[in-house]
């Protein structure tokens, strides 16, 4: 698990709502099926991925298993249930590779370049999976968010970046 149960408590405090939480690995197809069966899910906001570029270079298989296998399970379950399926996918600007200065600023239509890390490759592959599945399954709708460096937190500071160990980006150092 690369999140904190404390975050769930904080979201409940902020919203005043009780949230249902399942602690599971979405690579576990049976557990994922159970969650969808027990709930009337018609939309998913998918943020479940490892995101440390350096770690992905050192441990690429960890990233492929977590970021891609879990994503495939989720999308397959969404499209085979026969209901309307909507997904918001958290991608990354790393899909653009390392553009040359004359290719800046980056625009959304800019083609992908060679992935600069296994993390970036997982995002490129996942976007490709979504693109193909949206074409093949009329019940699937997808929105992809390509962050450059997501920053910020709730004004209460109860939710936001909570890195384990040394942070991988600037914001935790300055907040």
Identify what each model region corresponds to.
Residues 1-155:
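N-terminal Rossmann-like NAD(P)+-binding domain of SDR-like oxidoreductases, especially those catalyzing
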Residues 121, 144, 159-175:
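Substrate-positioning beta->alpha
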């Amino acid at each position: 698990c690369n999140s904190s149960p404390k975050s769930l408590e904080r979201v409940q405090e902020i919203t005043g709502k009780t949230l249902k939480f399942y602690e599971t690995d979405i690579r576990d197809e049976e557990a994922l099926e159970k969650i969808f069966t027990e709930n009337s899910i018609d939309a998913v906001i998918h943020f479940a991925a490892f995101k440390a570029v350096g770690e992905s270079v050192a441990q690429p298989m960890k990233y492929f298993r977590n970021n891609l296998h879990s994503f495939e399970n989720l999308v397959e379950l969404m499209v085979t249930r026969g209901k309307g399926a909507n997904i918001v996918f958290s991608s990354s600007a790393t899909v653009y590779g390392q553009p040359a200065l004359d290719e800046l600023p980056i625009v959304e239509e800019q083609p992908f370049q060679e992935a600069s890390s296994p993390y970036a490759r997982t995002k490129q592959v996942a976007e490709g999976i979504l693109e193909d599945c949206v074409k093949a399954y009329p019940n699937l709708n997808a929105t992809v968010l390509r962050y450059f460096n997501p920053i910020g937190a709730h004004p209460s500071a109860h939710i936001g970046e909570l890195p384990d160990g040394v942070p991988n980006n600037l914001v935790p150092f300055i907040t």
